[in-house]
Amino acid sequence: MTKLFLFLALACLVVAPMAEEIMLSRDAETGLTIVADNLRDRSNASLTLQCNIRSFFVEEVENEYGRFTKVEVPGWVSANKVGEADIPVLNKIVEVPFGGAVHAQVVSNDRAESACEEYGIYSAIYPAQESVRKDQVATFAYNEEAYKESYSRADIVTVEEIGIMRGARLVLLTVAPIQYNAADQMLTVNNNVEIELTVDDVDWTTTEINKEQYASSYFYAASESILTAESLKVTPRADANYLMIADPMFKSSAKLAEFVAWKKQLGFNVKLVYTDETGATNDTLLAYIKAQYKEFKPTFALLIGDHGQIPGWYKQFYTDLYYFTVDGTDYIPDIMYGRFSANNEAELIPQIEKTMAYEKRQFADPAYLNRFALVAGWDANWAKKRGYPQIRYAIREYFKAPEYVAAEHGVNVFLSAGSQQNVNTIFNLVNKGVGFYNYTAHGDKTMFYDPKFTNDTVDQLTNKNMYPVVLGNCCLTGSYQIDTCFGEKWLRAKDKGAVCFIGGSSYTYWDEDLWFGVGACTITSAINNGEAPAKAETGDGAYEAAVNGMYNNCNDAVIYAGNLAVQATNSSRKEYYWKVYHLFGDPSVKPAWAHK
């Protein structure tokens, strides 16, 4: 019987100074490309793809259980077989036409087997580790029995159905060209792998109808996260339909009427309904939204009311996700959504006023958009390993002079090296006005935990008409079932606070939060030492959507991009992440950036 031993987290790994690059081929770059698009061949609808590995990297590490070698392919991800040898694989979300089952097979490949020593591997390959929930202690997983086995029987290529995202059928293609014989310390590398991806009984009628009715630039047309063949690309329709569902108490709200008029002025086709028409239970609301998806085809939806008026779904914790998974039986949302969480008009009015002022660019000082607050909060084990790389990635890729003020540690960048550092400095910076405030570490229902920024802190702000987009990569800050969670506080605060808040309604995890921010990537030794991954080594993540204009650059796109990054890994928490992250605010708002 296989034994899986879990040990308490290691104090630290002794790491070699630098990973060694093992060159395999100088003729092609590492990655996956489409070489033939035959999806419109009704007798054999298929895509032919080519997977190449130019090189991989090896690095020996040591802990109290012995020496191990890490094997990494830049831009790839872990196979995530916890406790077993951590072999890198290539994952890619691929769009395919509607029809029957999807199959993947290897047509040809160059296979080379050698002793591990020939590849610079002189010890057992490091075991894959489970991602750690942010309120829990790390463990070290080592499956002793797995290291006594020869080659695993895993296929070189597999395909898994993801589901439908707004009319687009998505699958996850996994290519595992590196195979490891742990018992004999042998390695097989399959290079120049030609893959045929086929679709049974392809249904182009359904595919084209879905494209015509639902294709949206807000969702995937501009995203590099999804591999889309030319035969599936279309010009998106005008997708400005906006469904708003409110509690009946707001029928007499002049401010809500003003908000609807404003969104129409921006070009949205707004449909405002109340729960005395739609029903106010999970099931009746879902049935109504499903019907509207077919008839009205909203791109955006806004729930107007708190949990007591428009209840979330309880699935381990409260979530709004399942109101919007209306196409197919999967968990991918088909409508971009947010919530104006309000128990009364006094809580609703500030959210509307701040949204309209922001969209009208009625800024007290437009220079506030040049400022930002990027915070890797404190955790003795994880701040450096996950927080620093995420924040450093954001600085290097996006928050650069001359558009933004120079990034300076202790001024607008905070890489915590101890508990409760820079509390007052962060408050003063946010109070002065920042366009973006990102915190990653520990959170609670009413606060960023360390350095602390609480509901009471929000009350002390005076940042009128200098409202940021706030992203909290941490636990519990979006727990909207309580009276006033941290996310709700930022939106409900009058003449202060934020224009939108993105946060978790339950616990989040260290690895997944990193991927959410920077895109899917291998957790390398460099990352564990606090370095940011190279852009070429990641997919697209929340920063690409927020700052770089992906997904037509709207607030809810941040969540879509972040969760698609997690979707492209082998995390066991893909649905969990779609459930946990929530947007407090208007999902259609386009963030204002200094460089736009």
Where on the chain are the PLM-derived regions?
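Sec-dependent N-terminal signal peptides
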Residues: 4-13
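Sec/Tat signal peptide C-region and signal peptidase I cleavage site
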Residues: 15-19
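Cysteine-dependent hydrolase recognition
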Residues: 20-596
